[in-house]
């Protein structure tokens, strides 16, 4: 930006909550001049802190930005069951009986929760916001609505499920896998798929 206090124009797509890890985060920046995507990735990783690695860089057209194509619409997560709340490193397998309980939980006509907003608190049916899920041996997979129109956090889903089965105090750990937006056909795709790599001759 310009003015008396110039700074980088940058933002994060759906910033990650405290206590979560992630395999797929997105940073949106404006550049003053073109740069080759591979070179940009190499230069960023050379000065990055431990635990943060830039994987790729793509350019998104102004048309897609202007039409709202880059607005996030979904995220998917892994939910791990912990031995205790003291460490996220010691995990245990998902109980086999949870699979049947989860199917019963999702088969409800509605899944009503009290959801807080900045101004109020209201009862919301979160079932339509759960786009997909699967109980695996090592973790629970969740595919949830994310963004300005609808936003469902994985901890709210799991808190509601654990209350449903009477195990509210179960310690869990969350890892986000990726963030998605809708393409021109309305299909959910990773944000990266909306752009193209930059190649400078």
Show the residue positions of the predicted features.
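Terminal, regulation- and interaction-focused segments at domain boundaries
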Residues: 27-30, 72-94, 98
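Short amphipathic beta-strand starts and helix->beta connectors
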Residues: 6-15, 57-66, 119-132
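Helix N-cap motif at beta-to-alpha junctions
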Residues: 32-37, 84-87, 147
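Short, charge-patterned binding micro-sites
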Residues: 2-32, 65
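Core RNA-modification/binding signature centered on pseudouridine synthases
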Residues: 4-5, 104-201
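Short amphipathic alpha-helices in soluble, non-transmembrane regions
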Residues: 39-48, 90-108, 157-158
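Ordered, amphipathic secondary-structure segments that act as subunit-interaction surfaces
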Residues: 23-78
